[in-house]
């Protein structure tokens, strides 16, 4: 029998999006707005960017170490995106949730699918851009990728966006502040109807995002 002072299990929020949808910026803003959330830091073989900090944004590791961890079953989920591998440490997540800590996990749709299989009680959220043209403008606006990489990211984004129906909620990032409000409502348990996957017009929007040609 559980005592009255038992610690409640933490909640896990899984957020996924195609590259360029604004996921990272939204997650950072959400963390500032919701102090009870903690960011689950993933491991990656990707090269560290100038503005990133090891242990804050990612744990940057070599291919050999990452593969060793994967083979040892230390990842709750892991996937390869654009030639780089990403993984979520199993112990890190399980210990945090058991202690009552609410976690936010920023991953791709492949990782989200694995998380839902392992922890079906998680809340999964997919972020969509308002249009394919806007997605391309955001990718080009970064100024960090070559033309070849941008074209590849747009192709991968089309496949990513085809998986939006798998998620509990869908947030369209047509306005940063509105998208942030929707994410906050979900985290607070207010269940905003506009972020539901049956949102009016969402099917048409998603179809256009997947099939539209890149802006020339």
Language-model-detected regions and their locations in the chain:
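Post-Walker A helix-loop "phosphate-sensing" segment adjacent to the P-loop in P-loop NTPases
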Residues: 31-40
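NTP-dependent small-molecule kinase module
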Residues: 2, 144-145, 159-216
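Conserved lysine of the Walker
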Residues: 23
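ATP-dependent small-molecule kinase phosphotransfer cores
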Residues: 42-103, 109-113
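Extreme N-terminal, non-catalytic leader segments
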Residues: 1-13, 35
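Conserved phosphate-donor/acceptor-positioning beta-strand/loop module used by diverse small-molecule
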Residues: 103-108, 117-141, 172-173
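P-loop (Walker A) phosphate-binding loop of NTP-binding proteins
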Residues: 16-18
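Post-Walker A alpha-helix
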Residues: 26-27
């Amino acid at each position: 029998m559980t005592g009255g002072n038992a610690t409640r299990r933490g909640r896990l929020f899984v957020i996924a999006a195609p590259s360029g949808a604004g996921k990272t910026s939204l997650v950072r803003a959400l963390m500032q707005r919701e102090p009870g959330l903690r960011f689950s830091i993933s491991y990656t073989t990707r090269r560290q960017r100038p503005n990133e900090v090891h242990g804050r944004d990612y744990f940057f590791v070599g291919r050999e170490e990452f593969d060793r961890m994967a083979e040892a079953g230390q990842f709750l989920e892991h996937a390869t995106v654009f030639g780089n591998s990403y993984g979520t440490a199993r112990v890190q997540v399980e210990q945090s949730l058991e202690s009552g800590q609410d976690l936010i996990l920023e991953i791709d749709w492949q990782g989200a699918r694995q998380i839902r299989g392992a922890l079906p009680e998680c809340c999964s959220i997919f972020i969509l851009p308002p249009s394919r043209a806007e997605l391309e403008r955001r990718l080009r606006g970064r100024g960090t990728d070559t033309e070849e990489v941008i074209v590849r990211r747009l192709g991968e984004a089309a496949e990513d966006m085809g998986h939006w129906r798998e998620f509990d909620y869908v947030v369209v990032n047509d306005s940063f502040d509105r998208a942030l409000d929707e994410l906050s409502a979900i985290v607070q348990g207010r269940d905003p109807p506009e972020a539901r996957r049956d949102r009016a017009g969402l099917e048409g929007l998603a179809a256009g995002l997947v099939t539209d040609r890149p802006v020339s």
